[in-house]
């Protein structure tokens, strides 16, 4: 349990957060094949992390094809999330981008039983959210105020409360099928 992020540091010292792994996610799979890590991971709160040797994963995938299929599904889901994040940063305005971020987080946490559909714990600071969304912390603060004033979403004491799920979903243009399309 706990909160972490994957990120890439830029030459000027700034950071772009790429993702927030949640319990059950497998991180760093690409580095098994590429044999190089092109980004880093950091715990944001106390977190439990279970390391697995890459050679062990490859061996298990050979011996247990269903595990290989599950890892392929997880990798495909992660790729779909990166596509959504690229669209967020490239084409959605700050309000839509922030709404999408919280909709995706709510959906992901709900899928693993860590959230109700409209309420979840979120210890992320506005600085961390800003690094994930390609915004400044000041801009994130303004957008969160807009969401609160529109009675769509509030954050209090590390808890996110979504007040109007349908309106927030519509604002975000959120279609969460890419997160849970496994049958």
Per-segment meaning from a language model:
Residues 1-7, 22-24:
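Glycine- and acidic-residue-biased ligand/ion/polar-headgroup-sensing regions
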Residues 4-16:
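A short beta-strand-loop-beta hairpin characteristic of the jelly-roll/cupin
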Residues 12-14, 35, 57-58, 169:
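Short, surface-exposed beta-strand-loop junctions and turns on beta-sheet-rich folds
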Residues 19, 42, 50, 96, ...:
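Residues that recognize and position ribonucleotide moieties
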Residues 19-84:
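Cyclic-nucleotide recognition modules
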Residues 45, 65-134:
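Polybasic "coupling" helices that flank or enter modular domains
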Residues 107-183:
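Phosphate-/nucleic-acid-contacting segments
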